[in-house]
């Protein structure tokens, strides 16, 4: 049977309400309740100072002795070994941040209400560090000369079996790997392509398949001149004067001959006998035309002789 004047035990695992000693109203009741909680549950944590702590006014029945939150961000408390509950020997209480899902590392509040985590030398266990990037390796001038000579010789994409041989030549002047040789040729090929696209007059690069991408203007002109066949135009001769042929046929017979020749040309399928007959008729007609002139000329000659 419970004694008079002792408050009944709490019905839940935690008790809400102000648990501070500086309360102006109901301070005796709070002190009596704390004393009763300490007697009934010797392993209990009583958190107070809600305005300063930021965790809230609550008493957690965690199976440990009464303690207050420390002023630091994190603190470690020892638990008595006589505790009836099976709990770990060490408990870490973190005030900032109060969320149990965040990693145990020191954080800093940001202006926007966020929470940024930063690594701490005290909480470096289990964290993964990003390795620092390797410094870029610059080839030596002797190695660049060897690579340029190989590239200009026509080997733009060296095969796999050639890359180790090139690396052995370059290792005489410094340490180099097969990957460095491969990437140098890739970068050199892209630089030559960009130079050709921008209209540069440098050395012509080679394409992916080993074909010549372009040629300089002078070389292309010489190549076209050598391939094109030599053509020499014929000499221009002065025009020769046309000598007129003397026509012995009388002008009266000319139309007849022209008509006969045109008729012969138009009738290509006429027989040779018809052509001969036409020529004989033209000659007879010409003689008939000339005969009156001869007759009139004879009396005149006779009159002169008389």
From Swiss-Prot:
Compartments where found: Nucleus
DNA-binding region residue numbers: 132-196
Reported function: Transcription factor which may be involved in developmental processes.
Feature: compositional bias, Pro residues: 1-11, 231-242
A Pfam family annotated for this UniProt entry: Homeodomain
Biased composition (Gly residues): 199-210
Composition bias, Basic and acidic residues: 126-142
Keyword match Nucleotide-binding: no
Top-rank taxon, per record: Eukaryota
Protein name listed in UniProt: WUSCHEL-related homeobox 13
Low complexity compositional bias, start-end: 243-270
Protein family membership: Belongs to the WUS homeobox family.
Location of the region described as Disordered in the Swiss-Prot/TrEMBL record: 1-20, 103-142, 190-276
Keyword set includes Transcription regulation: yes
GO cellular component annotations of the record: nucleus
Primary localization: nucleus
Entry GO MF terms: DNA binding; DNA-binding transcription factor activity
């Amino acid at each position: 049977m419970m004694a008079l004047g002792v408050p009944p035990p709490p019905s839940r695992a935690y008790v809400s309400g102000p648990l501070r000693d500086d309360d102006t109203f109901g301070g005796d009741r709070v002190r009596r309740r704390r004393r009763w909680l300490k007697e009934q549950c010797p392993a209990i944590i009583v958190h107070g100072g809600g305005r300063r702590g930021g965790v809230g006014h609550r008493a957690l029945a965690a199976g440990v002795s009464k303690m207050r939150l420390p002023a630091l961000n994190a603190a470690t408390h020892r638990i008595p070994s006589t505790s009836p509950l099976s709990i770990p020997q060490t408990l870490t209480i973190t005030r900032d941040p109060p969320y149990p899902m965040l990693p145990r590392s020191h954080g800093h509040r940001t202006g926007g209400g966020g929470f940024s985590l930063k690594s701490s030398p005290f909480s470096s266990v289990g964290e993964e560090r990003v390795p620092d990037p390797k410094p870029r390796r610059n080839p030596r001038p002797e190695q660049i000369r060897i690579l340029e000579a190989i590239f200009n010789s026509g080997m733009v994409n060296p095969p796999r079996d050639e890359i180790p041989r090139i690396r052995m030549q370059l290792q005489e002047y410094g340490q180099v790997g097969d990957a460095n040789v491969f990437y140098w040729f890739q970068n050199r090929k892209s630089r030559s392509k960009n130079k050709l696209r921008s209209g540069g007059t440098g050395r012509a690069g080679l394409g992916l398949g080993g074909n010549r991408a372009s040629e300089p203007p002078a070389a292309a002109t010489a190549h076209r001149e050598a391939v094109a066949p030599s053509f020499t135009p014929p000499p221009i001769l002065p025009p020769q004067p046309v000598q007129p042929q003397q026509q012995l046929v009388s002008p009266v017979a000319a139309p007849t001959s022209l008509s006969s020749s045109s008729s012969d040309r138009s009738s290509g399928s006429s027989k040779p006998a018809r052509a001969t007959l036409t020529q004989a008729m033209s000659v007879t007609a010409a003689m008939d035309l000339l005969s009156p002139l001869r007759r009139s000329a004879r009396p005149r000659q006779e009159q002169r002789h008389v």
